[in-house]
Amino acid sequence: MFIGRVTGHLVTTQKEPAMADSKLVVVEACSGAGPAEPALKATGKVLVAVDSLGAGVGEFVLVTQGSSARLTERTRTMPVDAVVIGIVDTVRLQDRVLRRADGTLTG
């Protein structure tokens, strides 16, 4: 799993029938949830993920990939490689809050 930020939505006019009602989002992976890094930063790695939670552009999300992406009730029969499994409210590391739901950061 990794933390990423939704940077956009992907619209397709045709897709695999099993995915007909699926919302797709563009997610950029983040790094920096370590002792030396005071904030989450974009890595430049971008991927497309199925999102059944309704994440919006700018929100931080928890993403899983590979065979684990096909273990949710919704994606069990879909040909997917990445799925949003959570919308991040707060990231805490030891005594620091890296990200709060209101978008503010503290160190």
What is the predicted function of each stretch?
Residues 18-27:
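Short aromatic-glycine-enriched beta-strand elements
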Residues 47-83:
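Mid-chain, well-packed structural core segment of small domains
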Residues 1-13:
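Structural detector for short beta-strands of small beta-barrel domains
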Residues 69-106:
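C-terminal structural segments of small proteins and small subunits
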Residues 39-47:
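Short, structured beta-strand/loop micro-motifs enriched in basic residues and often containing a Trp
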Residues 9, 30, 66-67:
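Short, surface-exposed secondary-structure boundary micro-motifs
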